[in-house]
Swiss-Prot record:
Oligomer status and interactors: Component of the MAJIN-TERB1-TERB2 complex.
GO CC annotations, alphabetized: chromosome, telomeric region; nuclear inner membrane
A GO BP annotation: meiotic telomere clustering
Recorded coiled-coil stretches: none
Protein family membership: Belongs to the TERB2 family.
Function: Meiosis-specific telomere-associated protein involved in meiotic telomere attachment to the nucleus inner membrane, a crucial step for homologous pairing and synapsis. Component of the MAJIN-TERB1-TERB2 complex, which promotes telomere cap exchange by mediating attachment of telomeric DNA to the inner nuclear membrane and replacement of the protective cap of telomeric chromosomes: in early meiosis, the MAJIN-TERB1-TERB2 complex associates with telomeric DNA and the shelterin/telosome complex.
Cross-referenced InterPro entries: TERB2
Protein name in UniProt: Telomere repeats-binding bouquet formation protein 2
């Protein structure tokens, strides 16, 4: 799956993830020559050095969260997983974004774990005396994302809020469904081409075009 691809891994990435990359034909190299840069912690020293590099400042390098590789594993495909959802920005950028979106896609696993703690599977021997209809209702209740729980089972996970279109957990448009564009592509740079970046407390996207 990763043949002829190179990657750099931060010390914060688990060894199992690195082993998976190698087992699928991927090579490991220095961050300056690697095609992919993976880290699990924006505050780790090796990752902060990349954030402070000229390559990163000039948009020649991008750091991704290694959970991208775990998302590729069950699909056995790199192209079916939008890697742009797994961009790992510096800590101060993450704090600004979390104030708007709630959390990043790689943090969804915390929500899954939290829901499992709230709605643990009921042992079969306990359900043996209940009717099939009641069991189905219990299962449906567990599958409901907005299950109402008692105060003694309060979830500490933060609530999803206005997840941006460019970093959605689900519902994104597949690349095969996108219309082809044959014109010239230009990078988005704040303060250039009549655009700027500002922060807003309303649910609208944070990018606005200047009034002409």
């Amino acid at each position: 799956m990763f043949k002829r691809k190179t990657a750099w891994f931060s010390d914060s990435v688990e060894k199992e993830v690195i082993s998976f990359w190698v087992s699928e034909g991927g090579d490991i190299s220095s961050w300056k020559t690697a095609g992919y840069l993976f880290s699990d912690d924006a505050s780790s020293e090796d990752t902060k050095r990349i954030y402070g590099s000229e390559d990163y400042v000039k948009n020649r390098a991008t750091v991704f969260h290694s959970s991208f590789l775990l998302a590729c594993q069950p699909r056995q495909s790199v192209t079916s997983v939008p890697i742009g959802h797994y961009v790992l920005p510096p800590d101060f950028v993450q704090n600004e974004m979390k104030a708007i979106i709630g959390r990043f896609i790689w943090e969804k696993d915390e929500q899954v774990i939290c829901e499992e703690q709230i709605n643990p599977e009921v042992p079969k021997d306990i359900l043996s005396g209940e009717t099939e209809d009641h069991a189905l209702r219990e299962r449906s209740s567990q599958d409901d994302y907005q299950t109402v729980t008692s105060q003694s089972k309060v979830c500490s996970c933060c609530e999803m809020r206005q997840y941006p279109v460019n970093n959605m957990i689900s519902g994104y448009v597949h690349i095969d469904q996108m219309r082809k564009y044959s014109g010239e592509l230009k990078d988005f740079l704040p303060s250039l081409h009549g655009h700027d970046v500002s922060r807003s407390n309303d649910p609208t996207p944070p990018f606005h075009r200047k009034a002409v």
